[in-house]
Amino acid sequence: VAFYVLAHSIITRASQPIKIIPINKDMLPEYTRGKDDGSTAFTYTRFLTPFLSGYVGQSLFLDADMLCLCDITEVLEYTSTSTDDVFVVKHNYTPKEGKKFLGNIQHVYPKKNWSSMMVFNNFAQACRRLTPEVVNTASGKYLHQFEWSSDERIGELPPEWNHLVGEYAPNPDAKIVHYTLGTPCFAGYEDQEFATEWFAERERMLAHD
């Protein structure tokens, strides 16, 4: 349900037509990577975004456990004139909890959560390195720590574009909310920051069905 709530929050606030495509490994014959390190396919398939976009234009990747509270075209306009390879919020934090929802282990590593929200410049040579072959074989470190790019070519977005609920101090001006510990639909997370907004969005979505 989290994906549909996020998609609804994007579409209803966008000032221009937006195409939203879920990345589903079962619909990606190019993705052949096995569970070699215990990670899920979603850990890696996000890096196929430039390939799936034909290495043309800009593409925005978002984790599904988010909520958009702004016109999403703002972030694309913010990055449109840059030649950087990719734009992210450059989080620098240590997770407060050792586990996430459903008991999942909270791994700690450099550039953690940078890849949860990425604006790709698909024309960039670095993005063209993200071929199915590379995504199928490269290490998680190579992908998630942006070794396919370089630090000076990773553009920085303001923190309100990927506000980590439960990790950062409350921010009423957050534009994209990230329920990184667990979405409000999970027990124990229904009273967290921006939970009311998430449930309201879900109700508006269901009312349109």
Question: Which ranges hold each PLM region?
Answer:
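Conserved catalytic core of nucleotide-sugar-dependent glycosyltransferases
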Residues: 78-143
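A short acidic, often aromatic-flanked loop/helix-cap motif at beta-alpha or helix-coil junctions
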Residues: 26-31, 94-96, 162-166
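Short, surface-exposed amphipathic charged segments that create phosphate/polyanion-binding patches used
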Residues: 33-40, 100-105, 171-174
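GT-A fold catalytic core of metal-dependent nucleotide-sugar glycosyltransferases
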Residues: 45-95, 119
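A glycosyltransferase accessory/donor-loop signature
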Residues: 16, 22-24, 117-209
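A general structural signal for short secondary-structure junctions and capping/turn motifs
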Residues: 51, 76-79, 107-110, 145-149, ...
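N-terminal anchoring/stem segment of glycosyltransferases
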Residues: 1-45, 52-55, 196-209
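Short, well-ordered loop/turn elements at secondary-structure boundaries
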Residues: 55-56, 82, 112-114, 150-151, ...
